[in-house]
Amino acid sequence: RVFFTNSGGEANEGALKAARRYAYTKGSGRYEFIAMENSFHGRSFGAVSVTGHDSYREPFEPLVPGVKFAKFNDLDSVKSLVNEKTCAIILEPLQGEGGIHLATQEFMEGIRKLCDENDILMICDEVQCGMGRTGTMFAWQGYGVKPDILTMAKAIGNGIPVGAFAMTEEVAGYSLKPGDHGATYGGNPLACTAVKTVLSIFERKNIVGHVNEIAPYFTEKLEELKAEFDCVTERRGKGLMQGLVITKPIKEINDRAIEEGLLIIQAQGNVIRFVPPLIVEKEHIDQMVEKMRRILA
């Protein structure tokens, strides 16, 4: 079942409430969340409470109680935090703001198994990495690991303010009831028309197929930049959501990019984040690479 919101932050707020309501209905007494270090889930109160960056949380403390942070891609770290009060584990299959870190297959499978064994809900935040960006409609599909709750936004409206969180039927049966949650403009006709149109275009133009065709070329060109410039130490990511670790000051890189007419953004640490349109072609990637060569020289 799907509940429409106005943004990704709102989608994550709804997901957290849905998880708490699930535990409440079952009478388990569970309320704690385990989130990941370097994660980003939004700036509203609940979403920022599960965001793994001190810089986002500290100015607004005390925040929502019962949140613990585990090391991303470290299953033992997660296991050490699980107890009888754990309600849900929330993670991004591919961390964007946190520095373009991709979850391993072992980690995703381990989280799913841990949740199944302890009646804990698995929440995947795909606000940024979903909608075809990693080569499947949603990133979790690339792992074959289905979450209990999925959040999405950004690309589902192609610029129109809209987000959503989806629950499995089992979770929905125990979760939000009429009056538990609401959004004045959630599911409004304009936003939902945009979503319907976007999904139609995805299917008609095989957008996910295009991502899979173009992504290897994108990766190849980023690897060329890494090989060519000593200041580029690592390439990270998957599909059309990738990053380069740079030793030069990122502000300097960003300023030069603006001069070149190239829109890039910094991720956690010295990482340049590349999140091109899903309809990008080789010629656009070539133009980007030439601009980056001038910027990094």
Model region roles, listed by residue range:
Residues 1-297:
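Conserved N-terminal phosphate-binding loop of PLP-dependent enzymes in the Aspartate aminotransferase
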